[in-house]
Amino acid sequence: VLAKTARGLLCIKQALPRLKVAQEWYAPVERNQAEVAWLRVATQIAPDCVPRVLGVDEQTKSFAMAYLDPAAYPVWKEQLRDGVIEPQTACMVAERLAAIHRATSGRPDLAEHFANDDTFYALRLESYFVATARAHPDVAAALHGLVKTTSANKHALVHGDVSPKNILAGPRGPVFLDAECAWYGDPAFDLAFCLNHLLLKCVWRP
């Protein structure tokens, strides 16, 4: 939600128990806390890669963050849709993700703080891989194996939703949004998730 205050505009985000998708899909509202925590870690590593967190309300499971004007921070997905293809944006997305993964690797403190296994499984592994395995039994064994491997790997802090719709092409490089699925696990997930979305965008712009 965009809020107007005496000091200017800001964004307020609240976690809802039911996600805004066509099918009935529920998720724990604690994912809001994971997002704030990820933003705070990421800004220490690459200060320009996330919006600034302005305040948190634990009771309502909401937080306020800096408003980034779309004129200066267009959504990367919309750029790709419109044929604005900047390879440098993709390079900087990879560089910033790598910096976050590298800086958070081998951190027992972060592993404990981001032990959001149940949320990550529900929002990412079950909803994508397990659901696909049910619909396509011929590849079920491979998908279940991938779920098992991904769940077992605990190497670095993972964003969990790195797609062009959650990335702003800012003047100082890409800005990551929507880290509700943040989890300490397999950083390969972030890379594969983003590459999958980029491959799908090729349908728009071969």
Tell where the protein language model's regions lie, with residue ranges.
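Histidine-centered active-site/metal-ligand motif
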Residues: 97, 101, 159, 197
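Active-site acidic catalytic loop and adjacent metal/ATP-binding pocket
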Residues: 1-12, 144-191
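Short intrinsically disordered, low-complexity coil segments enriched in acidic
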Residues: 1-10, 55, 87-90, 114-120, ...
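Active-site activation/catalytic loop segments of kinase-like enzymes and analogous catalytic loops
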Residues: 37, 188-206
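Conserved protein kinase catalytic core
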Residues: 19-20, 72, 167, 184-186, ...
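Residues immediately flanking
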Residues: 14, 67, 116-117, 179
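ATP-binding pocket architecture of kinase catalytic cores
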Residues: 4-108
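Active-site catalytic-loop/activation-segment of kinase and kinase-like phosphoryl-transfer enzymes
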Residues: 99-149
